[in-house]
Amino acid sequence: MRESPAPSPTLPTQVDVLVVGGGPAGLSAATVLARSRRSVVVVDAGEPRNAAADGVHAFLGHDGLPPGELLARGRQELATYGGRVVAGTAVDAVAPEGADRVTVTCADGSRWSARHLVVTSGAVDALPDVPGLAEQWGRAVVHCPYCHGWEVRDQRVVVLATSPAAMHQAGLFSQLTDAVTVVVHDPQALSVDDRDRLQALGIEVVQGPVSRLVTSAGRLTGVEVPHGILDADAVVVASFVEATSPVLTAVGLEPADLEMTGRVVARSVPADAVGRTTVPRVWAAGNVTDPMAQVVMAAAAGTRTGAMVNAEMVMEDQARRLAG
């Protein structure tokens, strides 16, 4: 399904709910709202976090589906209930205290007025500056054993230790293959006790740093370390995950640090269990609030937030009618 053009006379700028971000969380939230007979529009910049991946995994009924196909199906389902997707980038928002609407401005100058705003703009993965790493990201370079682990089973896996998450990753991937090697790229990533523990578990620890990934005909074959080249079929690395949303920043919601053993490993926007933020009428769901959430978790979060937004509007409407 093709995305709708920017706002026109047939697409009113006033809607019940505006969703910023057309990934699994955003489309799920919008579909719940559309099925509740709410006018809902999704503004999508077209930059899904998992675009580089070959397929989506650990999502019941959708295993192996290319990310783009999953989103295309989601847009089609949303359209069935009258919801719309428009291409655009939301860059500003105003949510005045006590007001009954939130106003969002897009990069093309279009403006939307909504009773509630749901931000599901996801997060960005910042990778270590190692030549070849970004080019293989989502294919031979992975981070999640539940998203990509089965695909690298029994292969030679190198864990690039750049943060405390490497210890966790090494253990999880050792369940999938006996050929796990940890390369200490950042000396602060692992403690002496961590290294001793890995070696006691039979996981080889090699001193880095990694200077580059080695490929042949576009396929990963190894990583270069100070003493030579380690053969590798896959590299595991923990990206620094950061929620970025100018819309949330504009209304006063700044990302908060997430720490692991005293080191900041991600930043996300605080929200409660149903996606409610501290700013009235502004909600958030998916990776923007939970950087580690897989696709199915992000979709579930969007569904839950969409349901809560609808319930909130029902109560608002009832209160208005009772007030006469």
Describe each region flagged by the PLM.
Residues 9, 15-69, 155, 165-188:
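Beta1-alpha1 glycine-rich phosphate/pyrophosphate-binding loop at the start
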Residues 21, 120-122, 127-129, 160, ...:
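Short, well-ordered coil/turn residues at beta-beta hairpins
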Residues 29-31, 167-169, 285-324:
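A conserved FAD-binding loop/helix module that cradles the flavin
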Residues 35, 39, 45-47, 54-80, ...:
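N-terminal glycine-rich dinucleotide-binding loop that anchors FAD/FMN and/or NAD(P) in oxidoreductases
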Residues 139-146, 156-169, 190-192:
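Active-site glycine-rich loop that binds ribose-phosphate moieties when present
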